[in-house]
UniProtKB/Swiss-Prot annotation:
Protein name: Protein transport protein SEC23-2
InterPro entries noted in UniProt: ADF-H/Gelsolin-like_dom_sf (IPR029006), Gelsolin-like_dom (IPR007123), Gelsolin-like_dom_sf (IPR036180), Sec23 (IPR037364), Sec23/24_helical_dom (IPR006900), Sec23/24_helical_dom_sf (IPR036175), Sec23/24_trunk_dom (IPR006896), Sec23_24_beta_S (IPR012990)
Gene3D superfamilies named in the record: beta-sandwich domain of Sec23/24, Sec23/Sec24 helical domain, Severin, von Willebrand factor, type A domain, Zn-finger domain of Sec23/24
Organism for this UniProt entry: Candida glabrata (strain ATCC 2001 / BCRC 20586 / JCM 3761 / NBRC 0622 / NRRL Y-65 / CBS 138) (Yeast)
Membrane topology: Peripheral membrane protein
């Protein structure tokens, strides 16, 4: 099966492409039935229809006309494959012929531009931490000013700064700088905020807010079209200076991050609820003022570590999580998005704030400073545009998953929040990820966003196979509604059909997509790791791997040497091995903020990028051979080669000992050694190609044998040769107590053939 072809066509990859016919049989497969779906995947020759979709009249269905529908031209009707109900075709389909079929009956993925225009343009609310040092703040100002030129002229702009206090700017005033100042140590309620800014009770202000008109007393005066306020905003940004509040020696600055976010989200709730909005937070350090306090101001109090959190010795952690989680729920319900950009060496509290971005489709980016290329380029890539000049980001997304009676939905893992629906009949009682619903809300979406969706086979017990093809197919339809940057409302519809067969049928094993399965299981593991002990999660991964091998490996009992896996299962164990060692589950060397950042990126990427994060790619360059992929293993490190490591988060070029000596001797500058110069350039060219479209921009590392940054490569390698094997010799010795892949596989084979559970 060509799994990637289906992904290119529909943006979908299933763990099993042929489903077992019963729930009992599906449980025997160990790896759940699930898929990775990219709603806005850039599909070649995507068909776009400039009319509203035809919707099934079934009260609990509402599926959309698709190629799997049975069409009866004589009665001008169609039968829905999801609910089997009969529907009338609209009059415009009356002249339909086999040669003149509408695109929705030909293509499994179609995008509709509906006739309902967007009333209010998108809103961008900049929230800037001014406790940064002057150099860092200047770099940030430059990036924000540049980003304004990338926004639509009619976009509504809001601006807020914070340090010890929160300052909300009224951009409607051209003559003087007018702003409202709020205490940073106070958690304002919605009614209080509205009354302070309008002089009226909320019940009196809601009516004028709804019509969108801007008056001197309305809350929406704080959000004005970019074309109207760009000059004023540029003046504000250029005159912005670090917070003047004095910082005693041995203390951190007073930083009211929590209060600023609370006010920003309440303000948008008051005037633009369910309107496309992004709150873009730029943080230069941790919040040191309650609400949302991350760490005390005294530097002698260290910021919490994973060990502190696990041992319940992080005094502010739970309270801060509760505060930011409440903001996350409010923001998601209001259809708004929060982005968090950190520009400092210290942690800023991403671990506490992550739900605000994860539940709304926002960006979480961890960088050392706003002056770094990683921040500058990643931030500007947020505003990337398509071929027609529109922003690739979209707003107010909503994903509904329709299934035929054979399937139920267990849940979704990705950057979304649940839309609670009580009338859905295809919802399972058992949850994986965000469950108990068939509809999820994504306040913001991009072509990068990919969601893991998990299914349960509805039939409880095995059934005898039915001979008709139609009865043996399970249908799934993904309906994504969103607001396009062009000002149109759109609906993208993807419909797929999967064959259902009894357990043990060879076609089920042949349909296993080990790459998609590894990523889906990794998403479950990462989701579990948020609440469960890390060791328990790794034990769960090991048990599922053993059970899968016991079901699908070919072996003789108690004979490890006889162990064999089919080609489409053979890589799955090593994916699990590298996942166990990855920063997603092994958090020993990472801060809580780093872990939050890594997991955030992992749960939004597609199969290919996720696999790079799990098992980085390693390419070897040498004078003797063309560039070629090599094992992620210490045996691949040789004196006469250059290695290119891609972990997704960083790209590293490693020069072997001999290559490094030649480079230091300057051989590349001698025309006689043009081949050597070309060899040095090859990995740089390939690295540059990897950097072009990636978001966020990876860190670039250039190192050599014995260099201090060579540790970034060695930490990712399978330690075939470690200090315990020094007597054997080897290319490079890796100083680690980690189990090697060879020992891991030997133990897996031993346990599998022994029949142990």
């Amino acid at each position: 099966m060509d799994f990637e072809a289906n992904e290119d066509l529909n943006g979908v990859r299933f763990s099993w492409n042929v489903f077992p016919s019963s729930k009992t049989d599906a449980n025997k497969n160990v790896v759940p039935v699930g898929c990775l779906y990219t709603p806005l995947k850039e599909i070649e020759d995507l068909q776009i229809a400039s009319y509203n979709p035809v919707v099934c009249a079934g009260p609990q269905c509402k599926a959309i006309l698709n190629p799997y529908c049975a069409i009866d031209p004589r009665s001008s009707s169609w039968t829905c494959p999801i609910c089997n109900s009969r529907n009338h075709l609209p009059p415009q389909y009356a002249n339909m012929t086999q040669e003149n079929m509408p695109i929705e009956l030909q293509q499994t993925t179609v995008e509709y531009i509906t006739n309902k225009p967007v009333q209010i343009p998108p809103i961008f609310f900049f929230v800037v931490d001014i406790t940064a040092e002057q150099e860092n703040l200047d770099a940030l100002k430059e990036s924000i000013i540049t980003s304004l030129s990338l926004l639509p002229p009619n976009a509504l702009i809001g601006f807020m700064t914070y340090g010890n206090v929160v300052q909300l700017y009224d951009l409607s005033c051209d003559i003087i700088e007018r702003c409202s100042v709020f205490r940073g140590d106070r958690e304002y309620q919605f009614d209080q905020l509205v009354e302070m800014l309008t002089g009226q009770k909320p019940s009196n202000t809601m009516a004028p807010l709804a019509n969108g008109k801007i008056t001197p007393l309305s809350l929406n005066r704080f959000f004005l079209p970019l074309e109207q306020v760009e000059f004023k905003l540029n003046q504000l940004l250029e005159s912005m200076s670090p917070d003047q509040w004095s910082v005693p020696a041995g203390h951190r600055p007073l930083r009211a991050t929590g209060s600023a976010l609370n006010i920003a989200t309440l303000l948008l709730q008051g005037c633009y609820k369910n309107v496309a909005s992004r709150i873009i937070l730029f943080a230069s350090g941790p919040g040191t003022v309650a609400p949302g306090l991350i760490v005390n101001t005294e530097l002698k109090d260290p910021i919490r570590s994973h060990h502190d959190i696990d041992s319940d010795r992080a005094p502010h952690y739970k309270k801060a999580c509760k505060f930011y989680n409440s903001i996350a729920e409010r923001v998601a319900e209001n259809g708004h998005t929060v982005d968090v950009f950190a520009g400092c060496y210290d942690q800023v509290g991403m671990s506490e704030m992550k739900k605000m971005t994860d539940s709304t489709g926002g960006v979480l980016l961890l960088t050392d400073a706003f002056s770094t290329a990683i921040f500058k380029q990643s931030y500007l890539r947020l505003f990337s545009k398509d071929e027609e000049g529109y922003l690739t980001m979209v707003f107010n997304g909503n994903l509904a998953v329709k299934t035929s009676k054979d399937l139920k939905l267990q849940g979704l893992i990705g950057h979304a929040s649940a839309v609670k629906k009580t009338d859905a009949t295809n919802v399972s009682d058992s949850e994986i990820g965000i469950g108990s619903t068939s509809v999820w809300k994504m306040s913001a979406l991009s072509p990068h966003h990919t969601y893991g969706i998990f299914f349960e086979i509805a039939n409880p017990n095995a059934v005898s196979p039915i001979t008709t093809d139609r009865a043996n197919l399970a249908y799934t339809q993904f309906i994504t509604q969103y607001q396009h940057a062009s000002g149109t409302n759109r609906v993208r519809v993807t419909t797929v059909a999967n064959q259902m067969l009894p357990f043990g049928t060879p076609a089920i094993a042949a349909s296993f997509d080990q790459e998609a399965a590894a990523v889906l299981m990794a998403r479950i593991a990462v989701f579990k790791a948020e609440t469960d002990d890390g060791a328990d999660v790794i034990r769960w991964l090991d048990r599922t791997l053993i059970k899968l091998c016991q079901k699908y490996a070919d072996y003789n009992k108690d004979d490890p040497a006889s162990f064999r896996l089919a080609p489409n299962f053979s890589l799955y164990p090593q994916f699990t091995y590298y996942l166990r060692r990855s920063q997603f589950l092994s958090v020993f060397n990472n801060s809580p903020d780093e872990t939050a950042f890594y997991r955030h990126i992992f749960t939004r990427e597609d199969t290919t990028n996720s696999l790079i994060m799990i098992q980085p790619t390693l390419t070897s360059f040498s004078m003797e051979e063309d560039p070629q992929p090599v094992l992620l293993d210490s045996i691949s490190v040789k004196p006469n080669t250059i290695l290119l490591l891609d972990t997704f988060f960083f790209i590293l070029i490693y020069h072997g000992e001999q290559i490094a000596q030649w480079r230091k001797a300057g051989y590349q500058d001698d025309p006689q050694y043009a081949d050597f110069k070309a060899l040095l350039e090859e990995p740089k060219v390939e690295a540059a190609e990897l950097l072009v479209d990636r978001f966020p921009l990876p860190r670039f590392i250039d190192t050599e044998a014995g260099g201090s940054q060579a540790r970034f490569l060695l930490s990712k390698l399978n330690p075939s040769d470690n200090y315990q094997d020094m007597a054997r010799g080897g290319s490079t010795i890796v100083l680690t107590d980690d189990v090697s892949l060879q020992n891991f596989m030997a133990h897996l084979q031993q346990v599998t053939v022994s029949g142990q559970p």
